[in-house]
Amino acid sequence: MTGSGGYGAGAVPAPHLPVLLAEVLEALEPARGKLILDGTFGAGGYTRALLEAGADVIAIDQDPDAIAGGKPLAQEFAPRLRLERGRFSEMEEIAGEMLDGIVLDVGVSSMQLDQAERGFSFRREGPLDMRMGQEGTSAADVVNKFKAGDLARIFGLLGEERHAGRIARAIEKGRAEKPFRTTGDLAELVERVIGHRPTDKIHPATRVFQGLRIFVNDELGELARALFAAERLLKPGGILAVVTFHSLEDRIVKRFLQARSGPQAQSRHLPEKAAAQPVFEKPMKPVSPGEAETAENPRARSAHLRAARRTAHPAGVQDFKLFGVPALFVTEQLGEKAR
């Protein structure tokens, strides 16, 4: 089925191109004798480039399809590539040793977007799923069971959708007649509620799908936990490089690196000399794709790369308040309802 928004099974899959590859390699400085962790293996673009540059790699992905697809690469570069299934927030347990570099490409992969049966994209008719790890609560569970007020928080805070309340109320009314089963079911309702003009730059369902996906996979919480884990794993001089695709992710990374690259705030009850020293050097200038890359890979247009070098000072305290992002706590607060 093809809806008026352009989603449908006949859409042509986009090529799986690693975003900002040259810039990521320049930041990470891969070389023989270095051990780098790729926290989001996906189709293996970063991992292959790191291996070809001489580095050894530990690659992680929570998607079993990505792990299965990476086995030929692991065989090609054995024993220099270790491929493990898991969340990137679990990198400490998986790596088990200190690292020279860490790269994270945050969010859903092109591979997942292009598989209709995974239910990530309103452009491809499929089950309303969105689970990166293919287990746990699905997007359909959330849409069909959560109260309108909770759905509005998900769409508004995580999707940054200004019509969140109207959409949530329409969902609550619509599911009383027929449950939402497919990506098309939801995308068509959103389009009916808020409309779609030819001049709109994005499909009206874009932000609703973003909010649902982030909630189902606890993407912001995963990112925050991964940043804390990364500073504990990196050797002095090691590089953290993070590619983000929307403002919430980028804000979390930006605030983390800002907080960790200056004298860290301590309790007012402690003496001034007890203030912790910077965990990272001043972050490198953020990078976005150029016109040539976005022309070849339109999905790269919203990408941002932020990177910083680890100092020799001890890792800081794991305090989620330093991010100052209310959306970070939505999944934690509503998560019990999804179980």
UniProtKB/Swiss-Prot annotation:
Region annotation (Disordered) maps to 263-312
Organism of this sequence: Chelativorans sp. (strain BNC1)
One Gene Ontology cellular component: cytoplasm
Cite the EC number: 2.1.1.199
In what ranges is there compositional bias, type Basic residues?
301-312
Q: Which keywords describe this protein according to UniProt?
A: Cytoplasm, Methyltransferase, rRNA processing, S-adenosyl-L-methionine, Transferase
Q: Which top EC class is given?
A: transferase
Q: Does the keyword S-adenosyl-L-methionine apply?
A: yes
InterPro entries the record matches: RsmH, SAM-dep_MeTrfase_MraW_recog, SAM-dependent_MTases_sf
Family under the similarity heading: Belongs to the methyltransferase superfamily. RsmH family.
Gene Ontology molecular function: rRNA (cytosine-N4-)-methyltransferase activity
Q: What is this protein called?
A: Ribosomal RNA small subunit methyltransferase H
Chief site of localization: cytoplasm
- What pairs make up the disulfide bonds? none
Recorded hits in Pfam families, A to Z, give:
Methyltransf_5
Reactions mediated catalytically: cytidine(1402) in 16S rRNA + S-adenosyl-L-methionine = N(4)-methylcytidine(1402) in 16S rRNA + S-adenosyl-L-homocysteine + H(+)
